[in-house]
Every structure is written in C-alpha cells, then in structure tokens.
C-alpha cells in the first residue's frame, strides 16, 4: 500500500471491529483506530473507507470521517479557540484543535479572533501545526500554470496600503488593488478572481471582475438579467 499521509485523506481497509470502533490497515505504520463515533453506518470488515489521519491528544495516529476546514499544505482562516503558555489552538473542524506555537505567530493570537495560517507538519515533533507566517510558504517563482485573464480561487490574506493581499490557488501571492475592489471584501474571504498581470518578481496582480471577453460576457449576462426583471 502507499505511505500514509498525515493531515490528509487516505483510503484504508477495515481489518478489525472492537467495542470502541474499527481498526484500519495502516501498512507499515500498524493498525489505525477509527473511534466508534466516526464509524459510518454499514461499514464492514474488508471495506475500504476514506478517512482523515491526525494525531490525538496522546500523539497517537488516529482516523476520523470528519472533514477539517483544510489539510496539510493548505491555507485557511481559522478562529482561535483557546491559548496557553505554549501557543494558540485553532478551530479547524476536528475534535482536537490545531496548534499554532508562539514562534509561528506574527502577533500574539487572541481568543475569538481569526487568522490566516498555513497548515504543515513540524519537522521536529511530527505534529500537524499552523503558522501565521504565511509568506514563507508562498511560491513566488514563475507560474507556468497561469496566464493573464485566467479565473483563479482566492483567499483574502490581509489589507495593505494599496489593496488586499491574496493567496492565489492555495500557492501564490497576489494583490487586488483598491481601485479594483467594487464590493465588500473581508479578511479570510474565499472568492474567485482573475489574473490581470504576472509581475517579474513572481507576484500576481488580481482583479475580482472578469477581463477581456469574459468581462463582456459577464456584462451581457447582467444586462439581460436586468432587462428581464
């Protein structure tokens, strides 16, 4: 079988049923527990099921059928659930909150506030952790997979003096200039945008409105909708 992916989705075979859940075949990693509360109805020994793998409070590999807001390698805007002397713990859709150590915070995180973070595996502890220092995880090299006018997915990262910084396609740094914003935009919003320019430094200029032919078609659709109201 392929190597298990911590902080990601895996398809694993059910090999044993116990009172407190199911054990799944983790290959060289050994059997992985899927606690009873997450066992799907009708699951039988020999079936393969998709599960998300993470470490429980005792740092043991465990499976869940819940879906977190994001997985390892992705960016997300997450709310702080609680803090202690080691860092902040963020809500990400699983029973165990996601840890963001103080060294990975740009400013001290506060309970109830939301922050854009990158999710990754800490090389020293092998834990799934978050980092608010997202710049180090953005790719500013050339973008062979992008072209001007292309529609892309955006995560609004932070406000700058000239516009809104965006994370483009969960990988690149982009900017929407203030004069290109014609609707309310909030920190942490996910939306679609369009590449208007690829700069020499690798960063992207983004617009929230279609460009070129797509802009004409969008305007035509809006006009037709208006005429039929």
Give the label of every model feature segment.
Residues 1-229:
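Single-stranded RNA-binding regions, centering on S1/OB-family and related RNA-binding modules
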């Amino acid at each position: 079988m392929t190597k298990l992916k911590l902080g990601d989705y895996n398809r694993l075979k059910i090999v044993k049923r116990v009172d407190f859940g199911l054990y799944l075949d983790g290959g060289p990693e050994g059997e992985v527990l899927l606690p009873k509360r997450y066992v799907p109805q009708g699951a039988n020994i020999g079936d393969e099921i998709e599960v998300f793998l993470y470490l429980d409070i005792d740092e043991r590999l465990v499976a869940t059928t819940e879906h977190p807001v994001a997985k390892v390698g992705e960016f997300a805007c997450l709310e702080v659930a609680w803090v202690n002397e080691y860092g902040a713990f963020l809500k990400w859709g699983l029973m165990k909150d996601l840890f963001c150590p103080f060294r990975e915070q740009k400013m001290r995180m506060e309970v109830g506030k939301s922050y854009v973070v990158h999710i990754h595996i800490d090389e020293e502890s092998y834990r799934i952790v978050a980092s608010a220092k997202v710049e180090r995880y953005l790719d500013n090299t050339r973008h062979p997979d992008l072209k001007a006018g292309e529609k892309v997915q955006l995560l609004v990262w932070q406000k700058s003096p000239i516009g809104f910084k965006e994370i483009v396609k969960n990988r690149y740094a982009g900017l929407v200039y203030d004069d290109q914003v014609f609707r309310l935009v909030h920190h942490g919003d996910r939306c679609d945008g369009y590449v208007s320019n690829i700069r020499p430094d690798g960063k992207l200029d983004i617009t929230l409105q279609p460009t070129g032919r797509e802009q004409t078609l969008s305007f035509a659709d809006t006009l037709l909708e208006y005429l039929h109201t």
